[in-house]
Amino acid sequence: PFEQFGAPWLKGPELAEHLNGHGLPGVTFRACAFTPTFDKFRGESCEGAFLHVTDERTFDPFVTGIAVFKACHDLGGPNFAWRADAYEFVEDLPAFDLLCGTGRVRQGIEAGWSLEKIVGGFEAERKPFLPLRARHLLY
């Protein structure tokens, strides 16, 4: 799951080129087209990108995830919208903030910050976390 993403209003080649332009380590993006069979865009033709991990040792899912949402936001213009209804029985927080554990990622994206600035805002928290997670990695 979550290897392929898109929306009816995105252009797959543009999205893939934009994401590949970041030069993110251990990942490449390929344009794709699909028609979801469930959920938000069920039955609608969508374009997007397929995320292909090329080197699991250098791949950074945290940075990649932020890059994906920032690209969809930036390229989607007025068509892009964060989920506004209740999620996991929580009504007072946007779903994206709940999943991220903070509103800082969304706020940075909305403010037009660069990917580097958004990610850099978490460096002090990430640095001690990375060694702790190492023993739990499967690959």
Say what each PLM segment does.
Residues 2, 6-121:
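Conserved functional hotspot residues or short segments at active or partner-binding sites
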Residues 122-126, 130-133:
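Short amphipathic alpha-helical coiled-coil/interface segments
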Residues 135-139:
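Charged phosphate-binding loop/patch that engages nucleotide di/tri-phosphates or the phosphate backbone
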